[in-house]
């Protein structure tokens, strides 16, 4: 079983080669942003950029982290409102000293996402080429490119941690070592610091389901199971603690935000499900232009969208073939079940339409 033999140590060279190859792929795809004097002009990129530039200058001049910015909505907090969090994301200590700016940081996170997919697949002893292609499929998913292009960098960078979190969870449950729990805690903490709560929530949902599958399918003694569950729970708590500087202030401010002030203590259901995917629009996974390519050409069920949710025919065919071939393995069953759960969540307000069609 692939779940039974995850190697504790792997050679560094294959991972270095994979990382270099992913970097070359990213540079080939986004060369205009890296090598040419071009930038992205999406409103979601330009609007926050203006205040970020001013806050960066204020931080540099004062030597203190700005906690208030007066330019938006007659003034609003920076940390509590998630409007200026770059300084609380620990990896930015390194990225801020590199000469390629925010776009370069996002591209490096794309490479990190691909390497995470590679590491996850190699942990199941897949061939290097197969693992590399799997990581590339995740890294080059059109959704990731759309997040980069349309100014949702935090969403992209938070999603980059998803395969790494699953990889770390597997290691904790198979090796039950403190070092693995520490690595998972760091991954979880950094992902939460990147502060796209929705993507982090999806990641934790998948991680929890995987942990449950690993506990049930392993047939270990109660003592061994409790040991692994303890390491896992500790990693989760430490991960939350790492990101506390972001979420403690935000939790105090939430009641005053637009979403938190809605009835019931959170965003109204109608508002929260405005961008639900109608079951019929799943066809765009195969034919991206079926409901238009976004913008003024879009005529689907969402209020508007800037891009189709294309997954790729080849990727989907390979995923289906892999599921059929290895459907008896716990991790494959986890992937199949989590895919169905993800679709049900995506349907949102249209779940009744899905139920009626069934």
Kindly label every feature range from the protein language model.
Residues 1-31, 227-232, 236:
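Start-transfer (signal-anchor) and selected internal transmembrane alpha helices
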């Amino acid at each position: 079983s692939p779940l039974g033999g995850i190697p504790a140590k792997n050679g560094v060279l294959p991972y270095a080669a994979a990382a270099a190859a992913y970097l070359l792929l990213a540079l080939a795809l986004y060369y205009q942003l890296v090598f040419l004097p071009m930038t992205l002009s999406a409103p979601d990129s330009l609007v926050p950029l203006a205040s970020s530039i001013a806050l960066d200058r204020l931080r540099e001049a004062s030597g203190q982290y700005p906690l208030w910015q007066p330019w938006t909505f007659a003034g609003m907090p920076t940390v509590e409102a998630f409007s200026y969090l770059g300084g609380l994301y620990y990896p930015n200590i390194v990225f801020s000293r590199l000469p390629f700016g925010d776009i370069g940081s996002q591209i490096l996170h794309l490479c990190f996402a691909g390497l995470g997919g590679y590491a996850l697949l190699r942990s199941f002893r897949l061939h290097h080429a197969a693992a590399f292609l799997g990581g590339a499929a995740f890294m080059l998913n059109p959704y990731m490119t759309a997040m980069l292009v349309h100014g949702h960098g935090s969403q992209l960078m938070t999603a980059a941690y998803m395969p790494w979190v699953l990889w770390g969870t597997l290691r904790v449950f198979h090796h039950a070592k403190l070092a693995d729990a520490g690595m998972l805690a760091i991954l979880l903490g950094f992902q939460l610091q990147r502060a796209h709560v929705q993507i982090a929530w999806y990641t934790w949902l998948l991680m929890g389901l995987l942990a449950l599958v690993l506990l049930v399918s392993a047939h270990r003694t109660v003592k061994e199971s409790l040991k692994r569950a303890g390491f896992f729970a500790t990693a989760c708590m430490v991960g939350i603690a790492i990101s506390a500087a972001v979420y403690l202030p935000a939790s105090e401010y939430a009641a005053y935000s637009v979403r938190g002030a809605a009835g019931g203590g959170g965003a109204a259901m109608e508002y929260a499900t405005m961008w639900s995917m109608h079951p019929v629009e799943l066809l765009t996974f195969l034919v991206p232009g079926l409901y238009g390519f976004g913008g003024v050409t879009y005529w689907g069920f969402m209020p508007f969208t800037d891009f189709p949710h294309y997954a790729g025919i080849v990727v989907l065919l390979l995923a289906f073939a892999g599921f059929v071939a290895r459907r008896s393995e716990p991790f494959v069953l986890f992937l199949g079940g989590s895919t169905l759960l993800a679709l049900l969540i995506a349907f949102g307000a249209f779940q009744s339409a899905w139920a009626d069609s069934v």
